[in-house]
């Protein structure tokens, strides 16, 4: 039998049980996601995808909106099941009635099936209508006692590829404080206290990636001492970030203009961390001064 070409996950379940968190989790796992798609549109959408090979992992949130829901979704499941090129699963999210009521009260939203405004009545009706679909689901997750982070971890464990289950990447970047802090930085380190190559005429137009500048920055005693402290701080905390489920940790190193000191430090840090972790290194403002000079 040929290998399935597309992975399809239909995410459904009780309103308030965590479908929004779930679809965000699938997006983090590389799935193409659509939230709240009407069941009748699913077959047409899958037919559209057959004309392209760009999407191989798809997650769809299908909500209960009417009494005809089960008949509509059953029709979808029958069509998908007969498609030999689609490997599909149903993820059903559930939670205790008491917890669902508490979540609705916290968000001050009304239940979609609560015609008279009573949340519990809507929950009971929805549970009754969804019971057949829950019985068909390959994956049922009770989110009553789960935090959003724990739900993301559960979904990752059940639906990610083996290579993704332990995925964790470190982004190291240099920047210049004069151009603003990186908005996506988790950790920021300031190296403006170190000797500045800018004041050495022969180094001014070079960057921290050039050996003369790199050596000038890193060979000072205070640089050597600070770098070792920095490395000793960062290396032990990376396993903790990974354990907590963080997929990317962004470490930013800044100097005044982001051309010399921060570039040298960030590059050395990235090279050392790359011995044990997947690392990407970038230098946001390395050429900013040169571009400004050229425009003037």
UniProtKB/Swiss-Prot annotation:
Annotated coiled-coil segments of the chain: none
Keyword Endoplasmic reticulum: no
Pfam families: PapZ_C, RapZ-like_N
Keywords: ATP-binding, GTP-binding, Nucleotide-binding
GO molecular function: ATP binding; GTP binding
Residues where GTP binds: 63-66
Keyword Cytoplasm on entry: no
Chain residues that bind ATP: 13-20
Signal peptide: none
UniProt-listed PANTHER family: RNASE ADAPTER PROTEIN RAPZ
The family this protein is said to belong to: Belongs to the RapZ-like family.
NCBIfam families: PRK05416.1
Its biological purpose: Displays ATPase and GTPase activities.
Name of the protein this chain belongs to: Nucleotide-binding protein SGO_0954
Classification lineage: Bacteria, Bacillati, Bacillota, Bacilli, Lactobacillales
